[in-house]
Amino acid sequence: DLCWRKQYVGIMELEYEGVKIYFIDNEYYFGGEKPYSDARYDLEKFAFFSRAVLSALPVIDFRPDVIHCHDWHTGLIPVYLKDSFASGEFYQGIKTIMTIHNLKFQGVWDIDTIKDIAGLSDYYFTSDKLKDYDNGNYLKGGIVYADMVTTVSDTYAEEIKTPFFGEGLDGLLRARSNCLRGIVNGIDYDEYNPATDKYIDKNFSKTNFRKEKVKNKTALQKELGLEVNPKKMMIGIVSRLTDQKGFDLISCVMDEMCQDAVQFVILGTGEERYENMFRHFDWKYGKSVSANIYYSEERSHKVYAACDAFLM
């Protein structure tokens, strides 16, 4: 039940390595070629997803202690838990965590449209809730109503409380300081175990890495057309190419670094200016810079195994 319209919710189940994973199915919202499309359509899509997630829980007979929400796309889940789902006994006591990966994207549209899409009353559109100037803001709603708010590092948690990095929400984040934490992104030590990783060219462990690890570097240098030189320092970047990552800080020193015995391997997509920046340095320093403007799970393993340093 999505405000004035009803939409089908399918539930698909997959068990992977002993963990049950549930998928929300709806051809109207999720049948396209890409996960994101028109901004207004995406707002409706993720309002549907948020309601569907909460509606599905009693159907699959799973009552979580905590629902972990990520970015604006799920910002309405903490709001709905305090609104249309608040009276249901099943939902009593469920806590929510709102994780901010990128504060720049907030799910903002005019208030009348968001009221219509989300089915929320005027009560929720005041400056201390979802109202953001004259608009409604999904992420702001998630930050206001979640029990805890996290970001991807302690540093970012502090930065977003300042006007420069706060994207207009710094005041709210300062107000929620006691509930705001930074948690550094982790890695799966089994999947990214160099002793057993099936994607890398030469497996190694802590007992032989000084001898064997460098073979991954020379193999990747050959594969990417870089100068094959085990003594070159290789810096790996596997990332979204956005402002928040600080790539503007290295743009002014790339020329100087590429004159030294340094190589860069970039893997990822993002803002056009950073994609083009790394393409430019690839063109200019083809034996020292490899710009791979896409994402590949296999190649990410190779970069992690080969590089001497990793730039985040």
Where are these regions (language model features)?
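Catalytic cores of nucleotide-sugar-dependent glycosyltransferases that transfer UDP/GDP/TDP-activated
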Residues: 1-312
